[in-house]
């Protein structure tokens, strides 16, 4: 269980590689990266948005397939190719007027740490690097790309009394 007042959470920001996709990347014959994503993460993401949580994607990756996947789920805040993530995070806060305490961030590696040190609720997948685990309030029992996003979304929605309590839960 996440040791944080999850009723404070208004937005969840996810990294992609190692969080919503596993830590390996297959390459196409043309050398393009192919990522695998978890369908349960996808269901939880679209449900969370229907129930009032803002979901954002913040990644160093520049792959258009990532944008297509998450736009297809209804995610509006997709930030790709972020070399330094903290400046994009600050822009996100300014756009919506959020405070750090209202944000959950799920990351898995060194580039995520600057944001994770600021947010109210830093979380990570089971296979995150040791440095990220050390600063996380919660380490999921699930590895990146295997449903760790669903894990944290479900905990937030349950804490807020919204998990499967609504007709919106029964459809995409």
Question: Over which residues does each language-model region extend?
Answer:
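Mg2+-dependent phosphoryl-transfer enzymes with acidic/Ser/Thr/Gly-rich catalytic loops
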Residues: 31-34, 73, 77, 86-172
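N-terminal charge/polar-biased segments
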Residues: 1-5, 162-165
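Alpha-helical substrate-recognition element adjacent to the catalytic core
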Residues: 2-84
């Amino acid at each position: 269980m996440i040791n944080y007042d999850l009723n404070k959470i208004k937005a969840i920001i996810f990294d992609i590689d190692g969080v919503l996709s596993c830590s390996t990347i297959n390459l196409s014959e043309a050398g393009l990266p192919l990522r695998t994503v978890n369908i349960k993460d996808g269901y939880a993401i679209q449900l969370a948005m229907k129930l009032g949580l803002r979901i954002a994607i913040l990644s160093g990756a520049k792959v258009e397939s990532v944008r297509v996947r998450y736009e297809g789920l209804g995610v509006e805040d997709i930030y790709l190719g972020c070399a330094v993530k903290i400046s994009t995070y600050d822009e996100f806060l300014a756009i919506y007027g959020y405070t750090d305490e209202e944000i959950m961030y799920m990351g898995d590696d060194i580039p995520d740490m600057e944001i994770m040190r600021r947010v109210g609720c830093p979380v990570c997948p089971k296979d995150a690097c040791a440095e990220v685990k050390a600063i996380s309030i919660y380490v999921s029992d699930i590895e990146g790309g295997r449903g760790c996003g669903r894990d944290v979304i479900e905990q937030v929605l349950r804490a807020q009394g919204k998990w499967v309590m609504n007709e919106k839960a029964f459809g995409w």
